[in-house]
């Protein structure tokens, strides 16, 4: 994307001014992103909205509507691209996940940002010292220096990227540019992203969630019978199943209660050559999770349960993400970047004010019909 300017010269900055207040809702609270930012962008080639970030082109000053005067913006790390990592203000105990890490790495690739030119910034009150992904983030983003911690956002700061702000669906230019830039060369992009992952995530024994569960793999009995009968499997459908969170986490969301039932149903209706398995990836070391993805052709899972590792799926594979209420575009972005197909399915769930959102059982028959439809669209039955 040659037309994207990360650090416009002073003479160019009049076209790229963030013209709204910066407060606690600017970062986090992703449900507020639609229509919340007032960005001036006179050049249609310059995107103001991307997945997991907003470009903010500052002239060094921010106009404050409350007191009708300009305010000086503090430069946290002059000359560097700042990645501001926040969490949803409503769920400050949420940990960062692999989607954030892979999304960040992809942003660096998308904008040709080198790690030595990055400065990572945390809000002190939204940083968890036991967050397992913090060390990975340090590895990915902090080669140019240690993270900076700021106490609050009352002071105005120059922020280049804000992680945890999802792509607005009303950004057709984003889709166009990603297609033109990456999807025309999926093999090249796929290889490049794998090189980046190998470079940054050289932590083979890192376990995603510290979950102890004996039921790591679940193969429907029907699948076992077929295997024992000599059936050769040519395709594999993997369901990521997290039925419990570790005790040190407060959230009980992103769970699939009826995983075995869904696996049994799929195994009973799909062609015999399609292997169906239910996997609790959270208790597997990272290298085993990646190995599993490389052997999967159709990946099903709840949003936030490890779907982003599907970036390691073989080319032209399928992501099928299960969500609640609205779409989050981690998987869409990464699937487009890596030459895969992506489908969403919004299901009903229950809201628990104490433990966050918990996914409940949903209609397996309806979901299976959609899986079959997507497989037919992608010639899986040939």
State the predicted function of each range.
Residues 1-382:
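The feature primarily captures lumenal catalytic ectodomains
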């Amino acid at each position: 994307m040659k037309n994207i300017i990360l650090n416009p010269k002073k003479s160019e900055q009049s076209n790229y001014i963030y013209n709204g207040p910066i407060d606690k809702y600017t970062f986090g609270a992703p449900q507020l992103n639609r229509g919340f930012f007032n960005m001036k962008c006179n050049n249609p080639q310059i995107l103001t909205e991307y997945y997991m970030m907003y470009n903010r082109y500052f002239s060094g000053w921010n106009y404050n509507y409350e007191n009708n005067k300009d305010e000086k913006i503090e430069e946290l790390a002059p000359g560097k691209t700042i990645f501001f990592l926040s969490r949803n203000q409503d769920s400050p105990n949420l940990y960062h996940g692999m989607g954030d890490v892979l999304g960040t790495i992809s942003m660096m690739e998308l904008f040709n940002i080198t790690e030595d030119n990055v400065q990572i910034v945390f809000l002190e009150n939204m940083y968890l010292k036991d967050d397992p992904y913090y060390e990975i983030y340090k590895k990915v983003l902090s080669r140019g220096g240690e993270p900076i911690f700021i106490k609050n956002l009352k002071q105005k700061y120059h922020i280049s990227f804000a992680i945890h702000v999802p792509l607005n669906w009303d950004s057709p230019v984003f889709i166009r540019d990603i297609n033109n830039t990456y999807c025309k060369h999926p093999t090249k992009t796929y290889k490049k992203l794998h090189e980046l992952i190998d470079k940054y995530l050289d932590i083979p024994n890192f376990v995603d969630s510290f979950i102890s569960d004996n039921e790591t793999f679940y193969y429907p009995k029907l699948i076992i019978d077929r295997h024992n009968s000599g059936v050769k499997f040519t395709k594999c459908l993997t369901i990521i199943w997290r039925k419990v969170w570790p005790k040190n986490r407060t959230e009980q969301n992103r769970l699939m209660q009826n995983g075995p039932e869904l696996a049994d149903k799929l195994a009973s209706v799909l062609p015999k050559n399609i292997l169906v398995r239910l996997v609790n990836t959270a208790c597997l070391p990272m290298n085993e999770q990646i190995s599993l993805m490389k052997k999967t052709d159709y990946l099903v899972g709840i949003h936030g349960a490890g779907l982003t590792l599907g970036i390691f799926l073989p080319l032209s594979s399928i992501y099928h993400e299960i969500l609640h209420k609205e779409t989050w575009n981690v998987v869409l972005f990464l699937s487009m970047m890596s030459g895969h197909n992506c489908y969403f399915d919004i299901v009903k769930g229950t809201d628990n004010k104490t433990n966050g959102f918990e996914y409940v059982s949903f209609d397996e028959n309806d979901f299976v019909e959609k899986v079959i439809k997507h497989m037919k669209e992608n010639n899986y039955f040939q």
